[in-house]
Amino acid sequence: MRTLLAALHCPKGDVAGNLAAHLRLLTGAATAGCALAVFPEMSLTGSVDPATHPERLIGLDHPAVAALAEATGETGVGACFGIAERSRAHEPHITQVFAASGQLIGAQRKRHLGEGEEAFTAATHTVVFGHRGVTFGVAICAEAGLDQPFDAAASGGAELMLFPAAPGLYGRRTSEDSWRKGFAWWEGSALGDARRQARRLGLWIGLAGQAGATADEDFPGLAALVGPDGGVAARLPDWRPGVLTVDIPLAGSGVVSVP
C-alpha cells in the first residue's frame, strides 16, 4: 500500500492554514498514487493545551474535519490526521481521525497521556481500522513506549501501526546545533520504540511527526517506516518538514522509498 508519511509544520490554532496544508499534501499523495496519507498528532489544530487555550479545541463535527473527509473522496486517498478534540461531553481529547471515501470512518483517542498533557482526558478504547484490505491501528506519540496499544491493535488483526507524534522540545531551538540535539533525542526515542514494537509483534510501523517552530514550542519532525524485523526501511534525514512516500508490502515483497 503506497503511503505518504508527513513531517508537517502545524501552527497552533491555525485550523484554516493547517487544513490548506493537509489538502495540498492529500492532492500530492493522489498524484503519487498513494492509498493513504498519515499526518502528525494534532496536525489540524496544532498542539493545544486545554488549560490555557480551550477555545482551540474542535469537535469531530467541525467544518475543517468535514472538508478534509470530503477531500478523501475527491482524491481517493484515505487520511489519518490529528486534532485536539472537544467531545460531545465537553471533554478534551488528543484524537487521531481516519477518513476515507469522503466519510469520517472513526477516531482513536489517546489512551496514555504524556508529560504536560494532564489537562486532557485519557481514553480507554482501542480502535482498529481497515483500508484497501489493510488492517491498522494507531499509537499516538508517548503511547509508543507502552506495549498495550500495540498488543490491543495486533489482537484485533492489525498488521500496520500508525505512529503520529508531536513531542514538544524543552527550550527553544535557536541554532542548527540546538535543532540537531533536539532531533537526536527524538530520533533515538521514536525509532527505538518503533523498532522494539515492530520486532516484538511483526508489525509495520509508520511514523509522522510535527516539525518546526510554533509560537511557543518547537517540534523535531521525523517521518519513517519501520519493518517487521525492526529495521528502518525508509526515513527523512532530519528535523525539517517533509514528506516520505513509501510502498508498504504487506504481502512481503520488499519496501521502497518513492522519490
Stretch-by-stretch model annotation:
Residues M1-L5:
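Extreme N-terminal starter segment of soluble prokaryotic enzymes
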Residues L60, A64-C80, G145-P241:
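CN hydrolase (nitrilase-like) catalytic-core segments centered on the catalytic cysteine
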Residues A7-H9, P40, R109, G209:
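Residue-level recognition of beta-strand->loop/alpha-helix junctions
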Residues A20-T31, A152:
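Short, well-structured alpha-helical segments in soluble
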Residues N18, A29-R56, A79-C80, E143, ...:
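Active-site beta-strand/loop signature of hydrolases that rely on acidic residues for catalysis
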Residues L60, S87-E176, G182-G192, W239, ...:
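Active-site catalytic loop in hydrolytic enzyme cores
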Residues F81-R86:
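Short beta-strand-to-loop element that shapes/binds the nucleotide-sugar donor at the catalytic cleft/hinge
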Residues A7-R24:
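N-terminal phosphate-binding loop and adjacent alpha-helix
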